[in-house]
Curated annotation (Swiss-Prot):
GO CC, alphabetical: cytosolic small ribosomal subunit
Originating species: Mesoplasma florum (strain ATCC 33453 / NBRC 100688 / NCTC 11704 / L1)
GO molecular function, one term: structural constituent of ribosome
Annotated KH type-2 domain residues: 39-108
Any GO BP annotation: translation
Xref: PROSITE patterns: KH_TYPE_2 (PS50823), RIBOSOMAL_S3 (PS00548)
Low complexity: compositionally biased ranges: 232-241
Official protein name in the record: Small ribosomal subunit protein uS3
rRNA-binding recorded as keyword: yes
Family matches, as InterPro entries: KH_dom, KH_dom-like_a/b, KH_dom_type_2, KH_sf_prok-type, Ribosomal_S3_C_sf, Ribosomal_uS3_bac-typ, Ribosomal_uS3_C, Ribosomal_uS3_CS
Keyword terms, alphabetized: Ribonucleoprotein, Ribosomal protein, RNA-binding, rRNA-binding
Subunit and interaction comment: Part of the 30S ribosomal subunit. Forms a tight complex with proteins S10 and S14.
Amino acid sequence: MGQKVSPNVLRLGIVRDWEDTWYAEKDQYVKWLDQDIKIREGVLKLLKDAAVSKIKIERTNSNITLIIRTARPAIVLGQEGKNVSNIATAVQKIAKDRNLKVEVKVIEVKNPDADATLVARWIGEQITNRASFRTVQKLAIRKALKAGVKGIKTSVSGRLGGVEMARTEGYIEGSVPLSTLRADIDYALYEAPTTYGQIGVKVWINHGEVIGGQSQRVSEKAPMNNDRRFNNKNNNRGGRK
């Protein structure tokens, strides 16, 4: 029986790199891994309005480098680097080492409409604000195709529109070859809180095939086709909103 797997994990070492880059002995591995999880949670909490896409961590015994990909670099830096100092202090507190040297590097996401993490978060935030889950998915797909992606797939799950029974609805446009390992697939999951429960938002974006170590991303507008919607078996129950 087939099983689903994260497209990001499936492509590690092939077309994607690890988000943590360090080496540790057995007794130190668990400690550093736990710290990395807490560091990401803490930094995302501090930069909740900065549209952070990914946080890569590189570290040694005495140094740690955070590489933050964001669509709003000015918010990450803050006035006179104030936010950077706050991040460094938070990391030292989590690591319980005041002498730990913390370096923060900021990389700007020039096209947030083609970033799966930012697209999923935007869809989730709109659903939290009571926007139509169908409308926001179509709008996100339209923006992504205009940004030049090869294909995009979206999916929302939960009590859509506040109905009694949970279901899944989504759209797909263009080519999204999840089984092609050389395809540069960007995947993200976001949980949107609503008054009637959590709504899960998933986004898959295809940036093209990786050839010679470089992704063949297009810059021109992709062709617009008719929307193709997929529903699960429970879609006919609970009514349409």
